[in-house]
From Swiss-Prot:
PROSITE patterns according to UniProt: WD_REPEATS_1, WD_REPEATS_2, WD_REPEATS_REGION
Keyword Nucleus: yes
Protein name as it appears in the record: Histone-binding protein MSI1
Organism annotation: Solanum lycopersicum
Transmembrane regions: none
Length: 424
């Protein structure tokens, strides 16, 4: 009987998800200025926009690139991938906003070819858990692998199509961990300084400018204080010696490289009631850090008074796996959870007055819910060149590139009687 009940439950859930998706699709023109949906051959666990942007002359779109990976079945090869994306110029977007029902796309703008194109595949041993580019030289990409090693690739030195022998040839192999993981962060201040957190409870720091032996580098420092998996690491964006780490032991630790101890962070707090999965330092405010947890909440901490959270965002119905600040707006934060939803928050609206009707949709700081995915979202990335454009990837192979409607985030619309929808 149990199996039948499970099957029925699964079928009901699938039907509900499909129903929700249909409603989302119908409402897309009211909620978005842009939606591009692209089915990848395999799911990607990682996505990150690259910082370059070109405007081909005489075209009504810009061309940008992003990093993706693969998570294939057992016998299929895995790749680190680069994709090229055509995004409408603002004028074109306003002239030709329409929804293409067949392709689940909104904001079409007359490109002859597909808007998303894989332009490079680099052989990779096992799935790409996470891939991030080095800020000082975006050709350099680090990847978290299914082994203990972290790989570094210079994609300008690799062919666009991978060698048929399937051999993975990273330009560097970084050693120091004993198991795989997800945490990965490049320093914006010190070129080549890379942090990594893994399931072995350790944090490794490498300087990729050091001299390798047989294309391999040992960690420059290994930090040990977490008891259990280190889920994420992040460099501070204003202070070059500071970085943060979070883990399954529920702790947020802040470290200072100027202190000699690799076992004593300068600040520590039990941040959540369950595993802490992610953290992000605010790019504008040097004191603010956000964390996300299996306890379904996102918390904000002030480094000057870290012992208690500044604020808790608790609308997610499932565990939170990723948080990320909008690179151009100090108060805008996004977070995604196991429950197929990506939420965008405007922290400047905390404690604003609400009508009881509005309160039913969520707290005032909940700006928008992206409901376009029908499977768990693995990663997302704010576009550094285009305001409010986000790329998100989910376990069902779907890559979505989207931009919420301008009237949702524009302050001039925050007038009495304004009830811009937040999304499904």
């Amino acid at each position: 009987m149990g199996k039948d009940e499970d099957e029925m439950r699964g079928e009901i859930e699938e039907r509900l998800i499909n129903e929700e998706y249909k409603i989302w699709k119908k409402n897309t023109p009211f909620l978005y200025d842009l939606v591009i949906t692209h089915a990848l051959e395999w799911p990607s666990l990682t996505v990150e926009w690259l910082p370059d942007r070109e405007e081909p002359s005489g075209k009504d779109y810009s061309v940008q690139k992003m990093i993706l990976g693969t998570h294939t079945s057992e016998n299929e090869p895995n790749y680190l991938m680069l994709a090229q994306v055509q995004l409408p110029l603002e004028d074109a977007e306003n002239d030709a906003r329409h929804y293409d029902d067949d392709r689940s796309e909104f904001g079409g703008f007359g490109c002859a070819n597909g808007k998303v194109q894989i332009i490079q595949q680099i052989n990779h041993d096992g799935e790409v858990n996470r891939a991030r580019y080095m800020p000082q030289n975006p050709f350099i990409i680090a990847t978290k692998t299914v082994s203990a090693e972290v790989y570094v690739f210079d994609y300008s030195k690799h062919p666009s199509k991978p060698p048929l022998d399937g051999a993975c040839n990273p330009d560097l192999r970084l050693r120091g961990h004993s198991t795989e993981g997800y945490g990965l962060s490049w320093s914006q201040f010190k070129q080549g300084h890379l942090l990594s957190g893994s399931d072995d409870s350790h944090i490794c720091l490498w300087d990729i400018n050091a001299t390798p032996k047989n294309k391999a580098l040992e960690a420059m420092q290994i930090f040990k204080v977490h008891e259990g998996v280190v889920e994420d690491v992040a460099w501070h964006l204003r202070h070059e010696y500071l970085f943060g780490s979070v883990g399954d032991d529920q702790y947020l630790h802040v470290w200072d490289l100027r202190t000699p101890s690799v076992t004593k962070p300068i600040q520590s707090v039990v941040a959540h009631q369950s595993e802490v999965n992610c953290l992000a330092f605010n790019p504008f405010n040097e004191w603010v850090v956000a964390t996300g947890s299996t306890d379904k909440t996102v918390k904000l901490f002030d480094l000057r008074k870290i012992s208690t959270a500044l604020h808790t965002l608790d609308c997610h119905k499932e565990e939170v796996f990723q948080v990320g600040w909008n690179p151009k707006n100090e108060t805008i934060l996004a977070s995604c959870c196991l429950g197929r939803r990506l939420m965008v928050w405007d922290l400047s609206r905390i404690d604003e007055e609400q009508t009881p009707e509005d309160a039913e949709d969520g707290p005032p700081e909940l700006l928008f819910i992206h409901g376009g995915h029908t499977s768990k979202i693995s990663d997302f990335s704010w576009n550094p060149c285009e305001d409010w454009v986000v790329a998100s990837v989910a376990e069902d192979n779907i890559l979505q590139i989207w931009q919420m409607a301008e009237n949702i985030y524009h302050d001039e619309d925050d007038l009495p009687g304004d009830d811009a929808p937040k999304g499904p």
